[in-house]
C-alpha cells in the first residue's frame, strides 16, 4: 500500500480544489482514471483511496509545491479573506517586504501552524540565486532561520555568460515540502555552486523545515549517465555534466520519490534532456531518463513551471527545441528515443516514456527555436462531453502560439502530414507565444502570452472555447505572465498576475471577466511598488495574503491595517 505522505499530497489538492472524485462540467465524477491510465478505477479502489485520505494528516492551508498541487492548476479554493469587493487600492496593498541576499526566481512556499523553537507560527520559505534558504515568520516578517546550500569554499555558480539566469546561479527551482518526512518535515531543492577549483556542482538537498538542518545524509551530488551516443556522450553513454545545466523546473514529489529536470545555459551545447528520480527518504538516485540520448538539446525548463503529474503514476512535461526522430517504430515511438520539442508522458517510478505528442512540423519548429518547451504542462480534471463520456486531458503551449490539448490516454504521437490525432488544437490562440504557466479554475483556463493580454478560455462539452471568453486590458511584456486564482470554493474568484516591467506590477482581475481589473500595484503610487520585474515569477496566495518574488526579496500584499 502506498505510504500516507503520497495521499497527503492528494488531500492538499482536494482541500484546495475539488472533492476526491474531482469536478467536471456536468457535476461530480463518479470514476477516477486507473493507475494504468487506460480505464476507470473501480469503486472499491476509490473507497480505499478515500479511507487513506481520511487517515492522512491534513494541512489544508499549506502551499508546499509549485502552483498548489501536482496537477499544477494554480488555484487555491480556500481563500475566505480576499474578495472582488475588498481587493482595491483603498483597502488592499503592500503590507510587508521580506529582504533576501539574492534574486527570488522560485515560488515561495508556506507551512501553516509550524512548530519552531520559538513557538508555533505560519512560516514562509524563500530560496535565492545566492544559494540561501530562508524561513520567515509570515505574520511578523522575523527571520526564523537562514542557511546556505554552499559547502565550504564554494560560491554560487557564475552565469556562464548567459543572461537567462544572472548574475549568479544558485537555487532557481521551486522546492517541494513533505511535512511527513523527517522529524518535522522536509524541504527538497536543487542548488548549483562552484568550488575553489573551478568545478561546478548540482546537489539535491533536503532540509528540516523547523531548523534548516540537512536531512538524510544530504546533500547528494547529482550524477548520471544514460545509454546513447548523443551530445556529451562517452563510451556509449551520454554523461550529465553539472556545468552545462540549470535546474529551473519546479520539483515534483510522488510515490516517495523526488523528480527533477534540467535545462541548458542559453542553448549552449553539448546538452540533452535529463529527468531524474531520487528516494525522498535516502536521497539515493532511483531512476534516470534522457529524452534525447542519441541526439542533442531537448532540455526541460518550462519557464520554471513544476513537473506535472496526474496522481496515477505519470509525469507530464514539455521539452525544448531538439532532435526528434521522425522515423518511428511499430508502436509509433521514435526509433532512437529522441523527443525534442514534444509533450511527453513519463511512467514513474521507472522513468520510461509512456506516450507523447509532437506537431507535424516539429523539426522545422525546433530549427527555428519555435518550440513547445517554453511553457508548462497542466493536468486538467476529468470532463464529460454531451454524451456523458469522460475525457482525461492535459494542456500545454509554447512559442508557436498554439494551445495543445491532449487526451492523456492517447496523446496523438507524430504524424508527418497533420496533427489530426491530437484531441484539440487551438492555432494562434495565444499570439506572441507562451513563456509561462497557465492556471485553471471553475471550467476556465487562463493563459498569459508574451506581449499580449491575459486571456480566459472556457471549457464546455470537454472542449476549450475556440476563442477567448475575456481578456485583460493589460498587455504583459516578455515573458507574459503566469497567473494563479484565489477563490472561496467557486465564489469570489480573483486572477492574480505579475507584470515583468520596471517597476513590476501585481494585477488582480475578476475571474469571471478579465477586462474588470480590481487592483494593480501602481494605482497607489510608490506605496505598493516592489522594484523591477523578475521574469517567470508567479504569485502565491494563502490566508488572505499575496506573496511575490522579486530581485531582492518577497513582497507581501494584503488588506491594509
Placement of each model-derived feature along the sequence:
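Mobile, glycine-rich extracellular loop/lid and propeptide segments
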Residues: 59-383, 389-414, 435-457, 480-487, ...
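Detector for outer-membrane/organellar transmembrane beta-barrel domains
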Residues: 453, 465-480
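Bacterial N-terminal signal peptides
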Residues: 10-21
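N-terminal propeptides/leader regions of secreted preproproteins
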Residues: 23-58
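Inter-blade linker and blade-boundary elements of WD-repeat/beta-propeller domains
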Residues: 417-430, 468-473
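N-terminal Sec-pathway targeting helices
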Residues: 2-10
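A conserved acidic, glycine/proline-rich C-terminal tail/linker
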Residues: 527-528
Amino acid at each position: 500500500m502506498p505510504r500516507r505522505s503520497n495521499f497527503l499530497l492528494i488531500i492538499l489538492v482536494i482541500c484546495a480544489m475539488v472533492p476526491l472524485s474531482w469536478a467536471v462540467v456536468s457535476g461530480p465524477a463518479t470514476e477516477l482514471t486507473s493507475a494504468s491510465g487506460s480505464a476507470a478505477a473501480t469503486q472499491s479502489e476509490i473507497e480505499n483511496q478515500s479511507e487513506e485520505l481520511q487517515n492522512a494528516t491534513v494541512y489544508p492551508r499549506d502551499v508546499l509545491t509549485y502552483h498548489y498541487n501536482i496537477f499544477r492548476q494554480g488555484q487555491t479554493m480556500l481563500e475566505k479573506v480576499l474578495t472582488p469587493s475588498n481587493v482595491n487600492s483603498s483597502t488592499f496593498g503592500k503590507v510587508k517586504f521580506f529582504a533576501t541576499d539574492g534574486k527570488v526566481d522560485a515560488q515561495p512556499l508556506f507551512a501553516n501552524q509550524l512548530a519552531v523553537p520559538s513557538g508555533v507560527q505560519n512560516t514562509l520559505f524563500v530560496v535565492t540565486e545566492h544559494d540561501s534558504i530562508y524561513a520567515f515568520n509570515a505574520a511578523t516578517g522575523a527571520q526564523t532561520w537562514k542557511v546556505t546550500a554552499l559547502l565550504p569554499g564554494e560560491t554560487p555558480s557564475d552565469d556562464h555568460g548567459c543572461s537567462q539566469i544572472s548574475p549568479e546561479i544558485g537555487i532557481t527551482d521551486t522546492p517541494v515540502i513533505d511535512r511527513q518526512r523527517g522529524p518535522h518535515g522536509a524541504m527538497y531543492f536543487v542548488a548549483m555552486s562552484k568550488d575553489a577549483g573551478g568545478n561546478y556542482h548540482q546537489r539535491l538537498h533536503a532540509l528540516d523545515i523547523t531548523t534548516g538542518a540537512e536531512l538524510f545524509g544530504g546533500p547528494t551530488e547529482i550524477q548520471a549517465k544514460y545509454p546513447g551516443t548523443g551530445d556529451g556522450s562517452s563510451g556509449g553513454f551520454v554523461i550529465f555534466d553539472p556545468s552545462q545545466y540549470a535546474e529551473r523546473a519546479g520539483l515534483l514529489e510522488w510515490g516517495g520519490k523526488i523528480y527533477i529536470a534540467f535545462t541548458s545555459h542559453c542553448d549552449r551545447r553539448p546538452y540533452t534532456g535529463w529527468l531524474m528520480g531520487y528516494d525522498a527518504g535516502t536521497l539515493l538516485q532511483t531512476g534516470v531518463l534522457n529524452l534525447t540520448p542519441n541526439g542533442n538539446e531537448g532540455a526541460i525548463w518550462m519557464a520554471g513551471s513544476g513537473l506535472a503529474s496526474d496522481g496515477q503514476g505519470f509525469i507530464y512535461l514539455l521539452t525544448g527545441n531538439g532532435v526528434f526522430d521522425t522515423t518511428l517504430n511499430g508502436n509509433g515511438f521514435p526509433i532512437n528515443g529522441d523527443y525534442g520539442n514534444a509533450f511527453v508522458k513519463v511512467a514513474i517510478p521507472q522513468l520510461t516514456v509512456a506516450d507523447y505528442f509532437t506537431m507535424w512540423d516539429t523539426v522545422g519548429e525546433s530549427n527555428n527555436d519555435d518550440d513547445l518547451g517554453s511553457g508548462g504542462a497542466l493536468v486538467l480534471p476529468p470532463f464529460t462531453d454531451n454524451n456523458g463520456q469522460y475525457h482525461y486531458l492535459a494542456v500545454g503551449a509554447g512559442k508557436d502560439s498554439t494551445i495543445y490539448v491532449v487526451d492523456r490516454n492517447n496523446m496523438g504521437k507524430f504524424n508527418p502530414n497533420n496533427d489530426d490525432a491530437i484531441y484539440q488544437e487551438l492555432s494562434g490562440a495565444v499570439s506572441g507565444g507562451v513563456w509561462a504557466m497557465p492556471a485553471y479554475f471553475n471550467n476556465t483556463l487562463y493563459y498569459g502570452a508574451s506581449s499580449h493580454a491575459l486571456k480566459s478560455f472556457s471549457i464546455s462539452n470537454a472542449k476549450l472555447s475556440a476563442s477567448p471568453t475575456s481578456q485583460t486590458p493589460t498587455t504583459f511584456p516578455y515573458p507574459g505572465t503566469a497567473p494563479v486564482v484565489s477563490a472561496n470554493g467557486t465564489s469570489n474568484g480573483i486572477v492574480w498576475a505579475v507584470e515583468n516591467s520596471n517597476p513590476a506590477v501585481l494585477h488582480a482581475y475578476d475571474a469571471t471577466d478579465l477586462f474588470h481589473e480590481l487592483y494593480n500595484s501602481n494605482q497607489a503610487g510608490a506605496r505598493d511598488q516592489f522594484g523591477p520585474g523578475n521574469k517567470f515569477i508567479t504569485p502565491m496566495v494563502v490566508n488572505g495574503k499575496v506573496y511575490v518574488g522579486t530581485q531582492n526579496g518577497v513582497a507581501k500584499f494584503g488588506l491594509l491595517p
